[in-house]
From Swiss-Prot:
This is Septin and tuftelin-interacting protein 1 homolog 1. The gene is STIPL1. Disruption phenotype: Long circadian-period phenotype under free-running conditions. Belongs to the TFP11/STIP family. Its main location: nucleus. It is found in: Nucleus. A motif (Nuclear localization signal) lies at residues 60-75, 156-186. GO terms for molecular function: DNA binding; U1 snRNP binding. It comes from Arabidopsis thaliana (Mouse-ear cress). Residues 200-245 form the G-patch domain. The keyword DNA-binding applies. Residues 354-401 form a coiled coil. Keywords: Coiled coil, DNA-binding, mRNA processing, mRNA splicing, Nucleus, Spliceosome. Residues 1-30, 69-78, 95-114, 167-176 have a biased composition (Basic and acidic residues).
Length: 849
């Protein structure tokens, strides 16, 4: 029965306090007079504050007053909900909520205190006739009325006996726990309540395991719950259906097991420290020590994590838009709601304050670093300005010295004592001592202005064609003083050196080139240009070539006559090819026209034509050279081969040598075609008849190899020539073997039949091209016959067609439509070659008038 000793029994033991029985009626000893109803009672009803406790008298009133005083002195726990006193006996096997258990414990302690106060009150009051016990009439030692006389019958006696037994048990218990009724401290409940369950719980599981239970829910399909339903504390003043409150749900089995393990460890810890914990329950709980983070630690932590990129983040997930400065606590509110953290609004506000403080610390640190960087940059700028100031001071001192030196040079120039050597030495000293100031102040221009009169005096009357080295050393020494080193191209006209050469050297070269230089003798001018190659600026060199050399060459070519000239034209034109290059292309048309006029009357026996034409093979373009050979040289060589006779007995090789001399000049395909058509048929026919006459093979073999050596290397390397020579060798081998020698014409016909159709078409097209002339070629031939100049006009086009000059008339050749157009009165009209000749003659007569 010890387990029910702290619980209140539901009985009638305390129903007859404060009165007595008289007969069959219960009479109160101190009956209060009924209090009159006041205005507040009428207004507030049961909600009015009552002062009936102050009006109570007697033992009951004094007990309620003392109880009220004690209750007023005890601080109420406002965080706990309203609890109701149970009217029945609570069985120990029922689960008791933590808050209700604490409330019942407090109630039991209050009852014990009330009984103590009653005993103390009884002992203090003095009565009559009992002495030191202080008991009055009608009261026993326990402060109650004499219930033996008041309670009637067996029922009353039984109730009184039970009350005495309970009172006696309470007194004994207080004596054991507190050491007496007076001055003893009330003991708290033991900390080992429920420890016995450790040895009793789990027996059911053991029995089930012995019967084959392996865990899981009960039932056929294991649909039963495994973990017990946990009771959840409903918030204070919350009704049953308020705000969709969620009732208890099945907890996770893993969490339940973890919770059981934690509960056992805690209970064991409490048991091991039971004595010390029981004594220290009255002490204040230990407060968690606050951890402070300094600004340096915060900045160091942020620096390790990395500061944000300065991006503004706007959170629009909730009902209100907010700006987020820290992503760490972005979901803190949702997590707090899920974890049921108390006072989430307060924690949110504190978190905002902490974030703002962190942001402010970071801003202050950022401003501090910016200020430090600004101070550092200002310090560097200060040092730079100091250095610039010193540099400017030195520059000013240098400028003063340079100005004084220039003044002294001016005085010497005015007095006439200044020479090129002394002037060069002074400016060389200035350039060496003050290189930056020399460039900045453009002292090269001042030096050029002072040296120019002296150079003009030196080169006065100079002939560059006869004395190319005159003044070369002086110009070379002044080039370094006058050129601009910053510019990659130091030979521009704007440099002082280019100006000096243009005003000193160029006039002398122009005068000598125009007046005394003969283009047919290019050596003097070439020698001068080679000597001054490294000293002449590019602008001056181009001026000499364009204004002196090229006009003189053009005039000489126009007046050149191959019939009267003793010196070949390539002798005095080709040396200018590396220097002039493409600028000579317009002269090639004139040279071709003049050569064509001479080649009309040329005979293959005249070797001078080869001497004049062969050097131009690499100069003219391939098409122009082939047309020239096809039109003027190849026909004459074909006639020479037709007249050539192959006679082993008395062979004359004069005409054959005429043809072989042109083997390196005439294109190889034209030469091979000419030999196949006009030489090898005769040669093979003579060999065939000779082999039929049964000659000596040694003579024929010597004759064959003798002819083979007469062919130049250009022909023997050609496949077509080798085939013809092999045919003769095959005929010779047939005769040696005693086989009948086949006729060369039959083999030629057989070879012609074996040639593919495509090759025959190409050969036919080539033969046709040799016979048919284009409209341009016809006009060229007509201009040569009339001794008129026919050449294209550079950079002049009309409707995408090149404009040519036929004498004094502009002509367009439309090769597609085979039309010839001439310009007349601002328009283009169809004309014939005779019309062009008439128009040229008319323009010539008009010009003479």
């Amino acid at each position: 029965m010890d387990e029910y000793q702290d619980m209140e029994r539901f009985s009638m033991d305390n129903d007859y306090e404060g009165g007595r029985w008289e007969g069959d009626e219960f009479v109160y000893q101190k009956r209060k007079e009924k209090r009159k109803q006041t205005k507040n009672d009428a207004t507030y009803g049961i909600f009015a504050e009552s002062d009936s406790d102050s009006d109570d008298s007697g033992g009951g009133g004094s007990r309620r007053k003392r109880r009220k005083d004690r209750d007023s002195g005890r601080k109420a726990d406002l965080t706990k909900p309203v609890n109701f006193v149970s009217t029945g006996t609570v069985m120990p096997n029922q689960e008791i909520d933590k808050d209700s258990r604490e409330h019942n414990d407090e109630k039991d302690r209050d009852k014990i205190e009330d009984n103590d106060m009653i005993d103390e009150d009884v002992e203090v009051r003095g009565g009559l006739g009992i002495g030191s016990s202080g008991l009055g009439l009608g009261f026993n030692a326990n402060g109650f009325d004499d219930e033996d006389n008041l309670l009637p019958g067996a029922l009353g006696k039984k109730i009184a006996d039970r009350a005495k037994m309970r009172g006696k048990a309470k007194v004994e218990k207080r004596g054991q726990e507190g050491g007496g009724a007076k001055g003893g401290k009330k003991n708290t409940l033991g900390s080992d309540i429920g420890q016995f369950e450790k040895s009793t719980k789990g027996i059911g599981m053991k029995l089930l395991e012995k019967m084959g239970y392996k865990g899981g829910g009960l039932g056929k399909n294991q649909q039963g719950i495994v973990a017990p339903i946990e009771a959840q504390l409903r918030p204070k003043n919350m009704g049953m259906g308020y705000n969709d409150f969620k009732e208890a749900k099945l907890p996770d089995l893993k969490k339940v097991e973890e919770k059981k393990i934690i509960g056992v460890s805690v209970s064991e810890n409490e048991q091991s420290h039971g004595d010390r914990g029981g004594k220290n329950l009255w002490k204040k709980k230990k407060v968690r020590k606050a951890v402070y983070v300094t600004a340096e630690e915060l900045l160091e932590k942020k620096q390790e994590a990395g500061f944000g990129g300065g991006q503004t983040i706007i959170d629009m997930r909730g009902p209100q838009v907010r700006v987020v400065t820290n992503l760490e606590n972005l979901d803190a509110e949702e997590k707090a709601k899920e974890a049921d953290v108390p006072m989430p609004e307060l924690q949110h506000n504190l978190r905002l304050i902490v974030d703002l403080v962190e942001h402010e610390i970071q801003k202050i640190d950022r401003d501090l670093r910016n200020e430090r960087e600004s101070a550092l940059s200002l310090q560097q700028e200060k040092e730079m300005l100091i250095n610039e100031e010193e540099k400017q001071k030195r520059h000013l001192e240098n400028m003063e010295y340079i100005a004084d030196e220039i003044s002294r040079i001016e005085l010497e120039n005015t007095s006439g004592n200044l020479t090129l050597d002394s002037l060069a030495i002074r400016f060389e000293d200035l350039q060496t001592s003050y290189p930056d100031d020399y460039k900045l102040c453009s002292l090269s221009t001042i030096a050029c202005s002072l040296a120019l009169p002296l150079f003009i005096r030196m080169f006065q009357g100079w002939d560059p064609l006869s004395d190319a080295v005159h003044g070369l050393k002086a110009i070379s020494s002044w080039r370094k003083l006058l050129e601009v080193e910053e510019d990659h191209n130091i030979w521009v006209v704007s440099t002082p050196y280019s100006q000096l050469v243009s005003e000193v050297v160029l006039p002398a070269v122009r005068i000598a080139g125009i007046n005394t230089w003969e283009p047919r003798d290019p050596e003097p001018m070439l020698r001068f240009l080679e000597t001054w190659e490294t000293l002449l600026p590019s602008s001056v060199l181009q001026t000499i070539l364009d204004t002196v050399v090229l006009p003189k060459l053009s005039t000489a070519v126009e007046y050149w006559d191959p019939r009267r000239e003793l010196v070949a034209i390539h002798v005095w034109v080709h040396p200018w090819l590396p220097i002039l290059g493409q600028k000579l292309e317009f002269l090639y048309q004139i040279i071709q026209m003049k050569l064509s006029n001479v080649l009309d009357a040329w005979h293959p026996s005249d070797s001078s034509a080869y001497t004049i034409l062969s050097p131009w093979k690499t100069v003219f373009d391939t098409t122009s050279w082939e047309q020239l050979m096809r039109r003027y040289i190849v026909p004459k060589l074909q006639l020479a081969l037709q007249e050539f006779q192959v006679n082993p007995a008395n062979q004359n090789l004069e005409r054959f040598d005429w043809v072989m001399k042109w083997a390196s000049a005439v294109p190889i395909h034209l030469m091979a075609d000419m030999m196949e058509r006009f030489f090898f048929p005769k040669w093979l026919d003579v060999l065939y008849h000779w082999l039929r006459a049964k000659p000596r093979f040694e003579e024929i073999q010597g004759w064959y190899y003798g002819w083979k050596e007469l062919f130049p290397q250009e022909l023997t390397a050609n496949e077509r020539i080798r085939i013809q020579l092999k045919r003769g060798l095959d005929m010779l081998m047939e005769a040696v073997e005693g086989v009948e020698v086949s006729q060369p014409r039959a083999k030629a016909n057989e070879r012609t039949q074996s040639v593919p159709a495509q090759a025959q078409a190409q050969a036919k097209a080539q033969m046709d091209s040799t016979e048919v002339l284009s409209l341009k070629e016809v006009l060229e031939v007509f201009a040569q016959e009339q001794e008129l100049l026919f050449k294209p006009k550079p950079n002049r086009m009309h409707n995408g067609l090149q404009i040519y000059g036929f004498g004094n008339v502009s002509v367009i050749i439309d090769s597609v439509n085979q039309k010839l157009l001439a310009q007349k009165d601002g328009g283009w009209f169809l004309v014939t070659p005779d019309d062009l000749l008439r128009m040229h003659n008319n323009t010539t007569v008009s010009a003479k008038r």
